[in-house]
Regions:
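Hydrophobic alpha-helical transmembrane segments and their immediately adjacent juxtamembrane loops
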Residues: 233-330
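Peripheral, non-transmembrane regulatory/ligand-interaction domains of membrane transport proteins
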Residues: 1-215, 219-221, 227-230, 234-237, ...
């Protein structure tokens, strides 16, 4: 599915017909943005003609758009630059299948045009597109401004994901400190997988953005270099934040193990107290279980002897409980 936005005769035009887009582009437009959402990783015939015949993009670049690899890429050609960058668009089950939330955005950028190609529906591109329709003089005042808006949204997706992870980790920490359960460890490991997957893709993204910070590239005007350096700095900051989260998840595992150890110690302490209390009871019951006549039998009789034995047991239990409480053993 294709959609395009550009200026024609002083007014903004949106178009979804590839042939009409090609016709208007050949009339030397000042700036055009074409967005192609691939269905089943395939280009339609009209889209193929647009990319190969109208823009004359290299077939290897087009092939890279059809088969995402989750590695950034910048390739410089005679009349354009091809790139592939990656961001995160969280899905409902992202904690179990985080890789499905990672998208690849391919782009062709040259003098007066930007072509974006992706295999998944990217909502942030729709937002930028609608803003460009509503405020074309602001959002599409230059190629650099349009490209910056796209890059900024991609990099910001990492920050949004980190906020989600922080909320999850804070909740886990509270649960662990209150009452650690086996399910908490499963959640920690799922979070760890998400963080390490983010780190894997984020570390390599800087190599793509650094190209647009160089003063000797032919695409970005000097006054806009500072914007793309901001993108590069933001990406570097995200990398450091992700590295910090990897350290935090290790600390969270240590907190869980410590909490489990404390909980186990409390259980063992309780069981030890029970066993210690029962021990004198067993001794007394074993003593009175012997088939002999005890001296107190002649004083208390059969019933009295039973109460005498039970009394010794109760007094022993109470005395031990008072002693344990005084020692703060439970």
């Amino acid at each position: 599915m294709i959609k395009a936005i550009y200026f024609k005769n002083g007014s903004v035009v949106t178009e979804r017909d590839a042939l009409k887009v090609a016709e208007d582009y050949n009339n030397k437009l000042d700036l055009i943005w074409i967005d192609i959402h691939l269905k089943n990783h395939e280009l339609t015939h009209q889209e193929t003609v647009l990319l190969t015949a109208t823009f004359r993009f290299h077939e290897m670049s087009i092939e890279d758009c059809l088969f995402p690899q989750y590695y950034p890429k910048i390739e410089e050609f005679e009349n354009y630059v091809f790139g592939a960058i990656h961001g995160i668009q969280l899905k409902p089950n992202y904690y179990q299948e985080f890789e499905d939330s990672i998208y690849e955005l391919n782009f062709f950028v040259g003098k007066g045009f930007l072509v974006t190609v992706h295999t998944e529906e990217l909502f942030f591109l729709e937002t930028i597109f609608e803003r460009a329709k509503a405020r074309p003089q602001v959002e599409m005042k230059s190629l650099e401004n349009l490209l910056y808006n796209v890059f900024n949204k991609v990099v910001s997706s990492y920050e949004f994901t980190l906020e989600k992870i922080d909320d999850k980790m804070e909740g886990l920490e509270d649960e662990i400190l209150e009452d650690p359960e086996a399910e908490n460890m499963e959640d920690i490991l799922d979070t760890k997988k998400v963080i390490f997957a983010m780190r894997k893709i984020a570390e390599s993204q800087q190599a793509a953005y650094v190209y647009f910070t160089r003063a000797n590239n032919n695409l970005i005007a000097r006054e806009y270099l500072v914007y793309f350096r901001d993108i590069y700095t933001q990406c570097a900051r995200m990398n450091q934040a992700i590295i910090m989260r990897t350290q935090m998840i290790v600390s969270l595992i240590e907190v869980y193990m410590s909490s489990v150890t404390v909980k186990l110690t409390e259980v063992m302490k309780f069981l030890t107290v029970i066993a210690t209390i029962v021990m004198p009871v067993l001794i007394v019951s074993g003593y009175y279980g012997m088939n002999v006549v005890f001296p107190e039998y002649s004083f208390f009789g059969q019933k009295g002897s039973w109460f005498f034995a039970v009394g010794i047991m109760l007094i022993t239990i109470i005395a031990m409980l008072v002693y344990f409480k005084k020692k703060k053993w439970f």
